[in-house]
């Protein structure tokens, strides 16, 4: 497919020909915004996306199914570019292996912007994301080839028949992302819910103020800001991925490739939470297969097996000769891998353990610390003997204890319990002193007068994690307790901030029953 030629208009051409200094001097005039923010009261009433409580990969990048970053030019129609050109086009191509780079493949932001502008109004009016999403759900849109973007005109009526064609590209649904304290506009958008939507392949649109330093941003670095700007217009953009190692979201703008990193940018998680006023996830109807479309090319049994290994959800699989080992959080994926291995080579042996989420994500996140010596963890019977097994089997009313050891190199110890009710509870945080033999050990849960642990409902798979660090992993006032999703996200952020060898870990898996 050929690349779409983007018309930039006079200001952008001058910036391109005049070099970086001219671009920097004219950023304010060159980069238009145009998002009409929704009021906190109205945002609270919008339908909300459900809380995400599942596996999050370390990285997600959906940009290959998005069109190339375009330019909204001098019109304040960023909302249409984000919702329609970016997100609605993506929904047409997320299951394909080509990038939509032709006008006939790209959804028209001009159609949406013009449909929402009253006839005869000037090209200075803004629209809200909710208005655009409502139009896309009720009416749809058409391609850029059918309704080209003319930056000199607005409130242009659609040609006869286009509205009927637009119905082919409706949204199935959209949902607002809730805030950390439900419907409290003073608290941030829930970042894990944004990442969760991206992880399941849903596009996310958001709006934030676009201050001067954001307009001047260039390169592959991470945009950061410590405080809200005093005054800046709201700007809508698409989120195309995230990277836990960078602790940043990947966004696609509508200011052309001369901005940011060829039209994209990384935005720091904390900055996103500080600035973002609203965010939405989108979904489209399942596209029907075009009549006469050729079937996908056949794959060999070896290719199918290799693909199953590479795509193992919430897991890690290793193939050594004819031995396949590892773990995954998905029983169906393990069964499919076993079947594919048998077809590829009947002599293969598959020993892939099932570790349901959140256990599988904890094991993936802590892969490097788990490989380092210095931390041990066991569960104990009521009389202090080691409980064996993987997982350790325990029944209702069983008394149990937890014993962990650490080392002089990493003397700070935290013990976290991921429980069957979906919560993460910090059982211990401290700095154990060495005993007479030099062993730094903590034993908890078996006291007759203080903490005493007893198995109680709800029952199911659980996990206890010991984390040993050279310096305190969590701050004195930092609360670790929360959901397992919140803990795993916090843990990833902590690992990014630690030196490579500063952390060691161990875990014990539990299975509690009635």
For each predicted feature, which ranges?
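Active-site-surrounding "flap" and adjacent substrate/cofactor-binding loops of secreted or lumenal enzymes
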Residues: 86-119
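Bacterial N-terminal signal peptides that target proteins for export
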Residues: 1-10
